[in-house]
């Protein structure tokens, strides 16, 4: 039976909630949270103990380059790793946000690793 948009969103949210139960970010090893929309991708390093964002990056930034959305996602990962290094962060826990680890989500993670962030 084909699923509609509402069912897909609810399923992704259930998966995200179950992942978040076992994942926790600290100021030493924050959580790299990913949100993917149809046009953009957003990533942020979150300290769950304090409840605030340490640094973030998205495809809305001017320094993000790439011809395809996957290339842009890799560039976002590299930009986030650079900003994390400036903030003194070298390790993070990867929170894929309920999305499959493929395509733009995977490219972002690989870009962050290439930028020097240990996931």
From Swiss-Prot:
GO terms under biological process: translation
Coiled-coil region: none
Tree of life domain: Bacteria
GO molecular function, one term: 5S rRNA binding
Keywords: Ribonucleoprotein, Ribosomal protein, RNA-binding, rRNA-binding
Region listing for Disordered, in residue ranges: 54-76
GO terms under cellular component: cytosolic large ribosomal subunit
Function: This is one of the proteins that bind and probably mediate the attachment of the 5S RNA into the large ribosomal subunit, where it forms part of the central protuberance.
Family that this chain belongs to: Belongs to the universal ribosomal protein uL18 family.
Subunit structure: Part of the 50S ribosomal subunit; part of the 5S rRNA/L5/L18/L25 subcomplex. Contacts the 5S and 23S rRNAs.
PANTHER family per UniProt: 39S RIBOSOMAL PROTEIN L18, MITOCHONDRIAL, LARGE RIBOSOMAL SUBUNIT PROTEIN UL18M
Protein name (Swiss-Prot/TrEMBL): Large ribosomal subunit protein uL18
Source organism of the structure: Salinibacter ruber (strain DSM 13855 / M31)
Taxon lineage: Bacteria, Pseudomonadati, Rhodothermota, Rhodothermia, Rhodothermales
Gene it is expressed from: rplR
């Amino acid at each position: 039976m084909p699923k509609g948009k509402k069912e897909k969103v609810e399923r992704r949210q259930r998966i995200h909630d179950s992942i978040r139960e076992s994942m926790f970010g600290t100021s030493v090893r924050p959580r790299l949270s990913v949100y993917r929309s149809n046009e953009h991708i957003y990533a942020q390093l979150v300290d769950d103990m304090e409840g605030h964002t340490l640094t973030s990056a998205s495809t809305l930034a001017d320094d993000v380059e790439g011809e395809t959305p996957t290339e842009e996602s890799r560039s976002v990962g590299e930009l986030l790793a650079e900003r994390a290094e400036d903030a003194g962060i070298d390790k993070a826990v990867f929170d894929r946000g309920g999305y499959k680890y493929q395509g733009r989500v995977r490219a972002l993670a690989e870009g962050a690793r290439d930028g020097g962030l240990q996931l």
